[in-house]
């Protein structure tokens, strides 16, 4: 048995791992510093400022919609209306792309794990609070376009993580694409770096591996296991 042959019931039984669902920011790419810079670039002209530590503590894990709402309300402003929110998100997306084009590091070990999965035909998907625009831009730069199916983004769900919808949709998409595998939530491993993401995955019935790429291990207590990054992690170690 591998590291994650753990059922979600009260007792432990072996489960066959059939698919991996990756979060994106902090799991595939070390993008949170870039997101912070983009948010700050848009917020500061409005008189809103916050530290990177506050960003990691209060805003990571939300999609851009809810992040802006929290930034405004926590800093004493009324939440933006829909029209203002749409402009903020568009401006932040452009700022983020400009920053990403200067270079983006991947999380240690993730490219090797993705390459192995693609070589073996092992199903992989993405469930992220980022926008499809952000994700596609980075995947294109990494030459990973087309490697994940499905890709569930903030554009497809009404609520941010910890709501379980994004992971539920990812499993549903995997099951529809690969009916012969009879993929169920408990057959899938989510790889996450935030408490909200772990809660989302567990709420949808997935197993969860936590990475301490953006925070401390004590924030990821719902995960079956917590490790620093994906260096040396292979499909064999996960099965």
Per-range role (PLM):
Residues 27, 128-130, 212:
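Conserved phosphate-coupling serine/threonine residues in phosphotransfer and NTP-handling enzymes
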Residues 31, 128-130, 194:
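Short linear Ser/Thr-Pro motifs
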